[in-house]
Swiss-Prot record:
Keywords: Cell cycle, Cell division, Centromere, Chromosome, Chromosome partition, Coiled coil, Kinetochore, Meiosis, Mitosis, Nucleus
Protein name: Kinetochore null protein 2
Provenance organism: Caenorhabditis elegans
Pfam families: Knl-2-like_dom, SANTA
Composition bias, Basic and acidic residues: 156-199, 359-385, 394-444, 453-480, 592-601
GO BP: cell division; chromosome segregation; meiotic cell cycle
């Protein structure tokens, strides 16, 4: 390494010196030099503390100064103007020191001094070569300015040699220090390894199984096990009948303290068995002696001591080792002292109650699996109480049992094994621990199905009728013996008997409940009795449905927060055939019918299927801005009036989803768009009405018919002979292009067929819209704005036929009176003529729909037909 790359030692030491940075500083000067004062933060950074320098001996830069004590001062802040003015420094001089100490600082300070201070002023002396510093290593000050600038002159031969020796000494010291640290590290690792081996040997020698020790001499808290739920059915089983009490006794031979005493052999009588054991072990080198500890007596942990043979580390005499092991076991067992023997609390046995379930108990099953399956994964364990082989199979089975189609099943269907039900869960809990094996837990206490609860209650009430008490308790054996013993007819009879018995029980229960309220029941009216009974049975039916099979197998019951609203049923009454019955008899009959209805409702409610879905809520129609803009454009295009026909057309053009009524669109236009009905003149309205009348069906035919009737009346007796014989005119009287002409039924005459009672909805003609040229009925095909030509033609033909028949019936009954003196009311039609027009329309519809003949002479039948037609609401006009 070349000498040119070596920095002088004095420079290195100066660079390692302390640098103090002053944020706010001031100057104190005298005749010799000046000192710096400032404030720096303390080591904690919580407060500022004042720092004063020694006499400044060197200026490196305007902000870096060096004092005689060997400290550097970095002026990072500003000068304290107020303090300097207070000390008598003029402002112009303070401005010169605003950016640090200038090069002419001595002249500036000299100009500030008084005459006396100037006479005593002496030049600033240079700092000594090596200032005294509290450092352990040799430190030299900075070189002189001549040496720093000279380059080659500052490094003399002696100085180089001295620097080399110092570097070698430092390297030697550093090498020795590293070797010492490495040696200490290796010794520490060896000591840690030795301690670890000692602890392992002690653990192998101390082969006692120990329970967790109590801290600070407190008694051991007994371990508690909790069974069942936290609220109900939980009980605590304590391991100890009472807390064991520590008692000082002889030291156990398995403890390390006793082994240490045996090894020492001082002031102790060593048994011969232990002496022989020590003599055998004397061949091996003794293990390192552990640290001395206090004597350890038999504690709570020794209650669980189970001695075992320590692992052999060397070849021993087998007979001698066996003797030593047994002697050690005897010594351990002889040295234990108990105040009382720990015992387990056993609850007194429950009374011998027969289990309600005919399924055999598994008394050997532990409760640990139950606890684990209950608290870790409740529904995923196949062996737990809640698991089942196939949830879908059980659910479909419940749905099939709840369907309307009832099938007679064996009475023991629930208790017989099905083909795919081998791994199905049991209907009852497993047997509990001692003294609790006969405990019954109904499935209604857990999230189980109501089906098993219902059958279990039947077994509890009528167990003798279902099985032989001396018979087997297994389901399969019981089902096989029953199938072999009884025939199919016997099973059906027993099933019916069970149903009858349940109905009798229900009837008795209802009668008991009615007797309690019989006194107040007599004073009530029949209507209130009917309503209250219906409401009561609606509530009970709902409860039965909630407890039925559909809410079982893990499905929780409905919460009480949302209860169904029961609608009161209106009791429909028919007029009594015999009005001479007394009120008491009527009330008695009413009670009997109510009782029958209750029985029927109960039997139906037990097996009524649940609705698979709820009635969907009507979708709320929202009118957005784009919908309102479209409606605005349609209204501007169509300019509708207040008529329904105009708004129907607006609704069709708008095609808003969910809107089917034109009144809704009209109200939206009024409320949201501020639409106002346009005002029209009477003349314009009359013209529109005339145009509408001309557009209506049959208007042209009616005008032609009136003209022809007027001409015939004016001609007199020039009528044809066939007009006297037939009330229906022939096809010759009409031109082919006439709207009122018929092409099929009128020419061929309507065939007379037998009268049919009733009719279907499909046979009713669609009702035409009066203001629309196109007819629309209830059928979906007629609601379409675009109809096929064939359908439109058929509809037009049918209506032509109806209008023609109505006009034929509207004529005067006799055409023989050909007087020319008839007034206008004669041929225009009077009151009777208008009545016959309505009747003719209705009868024409009857002919088309039902194929019936017209009997004009039967007035009663006409009245009945009028009533029927009003009920069917098939009138055209």
């Amino acid at each position: 390494m070349g000498d040119t790359e070596i920095v002088p030692l004095r420079v290195q030491n100066v660079l390692d010196s302390e640098i103090i940075r002053l944020n706010l500083w001031s100057m104190k000067f005298n005749a010799t030099s000046f000192k710096l004062e400032g404030f720096v933060r303390n080591e904690e950074g919580t407060m500022m503390q004042k720092v004063c320098s020694e006499f400044i001996c060197r200026r490196f830069t305007s902000t870096l100064l060096f004092d005689v004590s060997g400290r550097f001062f970095d002026l990072v802040g500003q000068i304290d103007r107020e303090y300097q003015q207070k000390m008598g420094m003029p402002s112009r001089i303070i401005d010169e020191f605003s950016n640090g100490i200038p090069e002419n600082w001595a002249d500036l300070i000299y100009s500030c001094m008084s005459a006396n201070q100037r006479s005593a002023l002496r030049p600033i002396q240079q700092a000594p070569k090596e200032p005294i510093r509290t450092r352990t290593e040799p430190i030299v000050t900075l070189a002189d300015e001549t040496e720093l600038t000279g380059g080659c002159q500052k490094n003399s031969e002696n100085e180089k040699e001295r620097n080399r020796r110092e570097r070698e000494e430092q390297q030697t010291k550093e090498r020795e220090r590293r070797l010492e640290e490495e040696k200490q590290r290796r010794d520490a690792e060896a000591e840690a390894e030795r301690r670890r081996k000692e602890e392992e040997e002690l653990e192998e020698a101390n082969y006692t199984l120990r329970a967790p020790k109590s801290q600070n001499g407190e008694p051991i808290t007994p371990i508690r096990f909790t069974r069942g739920h936290d609220n109900g059915g939980a009980k605590k089983v304590f391991i100890f009948e009472q807390t064991p009490v520590r008692k000082q006794g002889p030291i156990a031979s398995s403890t390390p303290q006793q082994k240490q005493r045996l090894a020492d052999g001082a002031n102790n009588q060593i048994p011969p068995t232990q002496k022989s054991q020590d003599s055998v072990q004397a061949v091996q080198p003794p293990p390192p002696r552990p640290a001395a500890r206090n004597a350890q007596f038999a504690s709570d942990a020794d209650l669980f001591a189970v001695p075992k043979a320590p692992p052999s580390k060397s070849v021993r005499n087998l007979a001698a080792s066996n003797v030593d092991i047994f002697a050690d076991v005897d010594s351990v067992l002889d040295t234990f002292h108990f105040e009382s023997t720990p015992g387990r609390v056993r609850k007194p046995g429950r009374r011998n109650v027969s289990s309600p379930s005919p399924e055999p108990r598994h008394r050997s099953s532990s409760r640990d699996g139950y606890e684990q399956s209950r608290y870790s994964q409740r529904y995923e364990h196949d062996n737990s109480r809640w698991s089942r082989h196939n949830a879908t199979y059980r659910r479909h089975e419940d749905e099939s049992r709840m369907s309307r189609k009832r099938s007679i099943v064996r009475d023991d269907f629930e208790y017989s094994r099905r083909h795919d039900d081998g791994a199905r869960r049991r209907d009852y809990y497993d047997a509990d621990i001692q003294g609790d094996s006969k405990r019954y837990r109904g499935r209604d206490a857990s999230s189980s199905s109501g089906r098993s609860v219902r059958f279990e209650e039947e077994h509890r009430r009528h167990g003798d009728e279902y099985r032989d008490p001396r018979g087997p308790r297994d389901y399969n054996d019981y089902g096989r013996r029953r199938n072999h013993a009884n025939s199919r007819s016997g099973e059906d009879e027993e099933k019916l008997n069970a149903i009858v018995r349940r109905e009798k029980e229900l009837r008795n229960r209802l009668q008991k409940s009615q007797k309690a309220s019989s006194s107040s029941y007599r004073h009530r009216s029949n209507s209130s009795d009917a309503e209250e009974s219906l409401n009561e049975w609606d509530i009970e039916n709902q409860e039965l449905l909630d407890n039925s099979m559909m809410f079982g197998d893990g499905i929780p019951k409905r919460s009480n927060a949302r209860k169904d609203k029961f609608v009161k049923k209106q009791a429909t009454r028919s007029k009594p055939a015999n009005s001479t019955k007394s009120p008491a008899q009527a009330r008695k009959k009413k009670r009997a019918s109510l009782e029958d209805n209750r029985d029927l409702n109960d039997s139906i409610a037990c097996n009524r299927p649940r609705r698979s879905c709820v009635t969907p809520v009507a979708k709320k129609i929202t009118w957005r801005k784009q919908d309102l803009d479209r409606l605005k454009r349609v209204i501007a295009l169509k300019k509708p009036s207040a008529s329904d026909a105009d708004w129907t057309e607006v609704l069709r053009l708008l095609a808003k989803e969910g809107v089917v009524e034109p009144e809704v669109v009209r109200q939206i236009a009024i409320t949201r768009l501020k639409w106002v009905e346009p005002e029209q003149n009477e003349e314009v309205l009359k013209q529109v009405e005339e145009v509408e009348q001309k557009r209506r069906r049959g208007a042209v035919a009616r005008v032609k018919e009136n003209v022809k009737m007027h001409e015939e009346l004016r001609e007199g007796g020039n009528h044809r002979a066939e007009d006297l014989q037939s009330g229906v005119e022939s096809m010759e009287d009409y031109q082919p292009e006439d709207v009122a002409a018929d092409q099929s039924l009128l020419a061929l005459r309507t065939p007379i067929v037998t009268k049919k009672r009733g009719g279907t909805r499909a046979s009713i003609m669609p009702k035409p819209v009066e203001d629309s040229p196109m007819s629309r009925g209830n059928n979906s095909t007629f609601n379409s704005p675009r109809l096929e030509q064939t359908k439109a033609k058929d509809i037009e033909t049918n209506f032509k036929y109806v209008q023609h028949l109505s006009m034929m019936q509207a004529r005067p009954s006799s055409r023989l009176k050909k007087s020319s003196s008839m007034n206008n009311s004669t041929y225009r039609g009077n009151k009777n003529t208008s009545i016959s027009l309505e009747k003719g329309t209705q009868k024409a519809l009857k002919i088309i729909n039902r194929g019936t003949t017209i009997h004009e002479d039967d007035e009663n039948e006409d009245n009945d037909d009028d009533d029927d037609m009003r009920e069917e609401d098939t009138s055209i006009y």
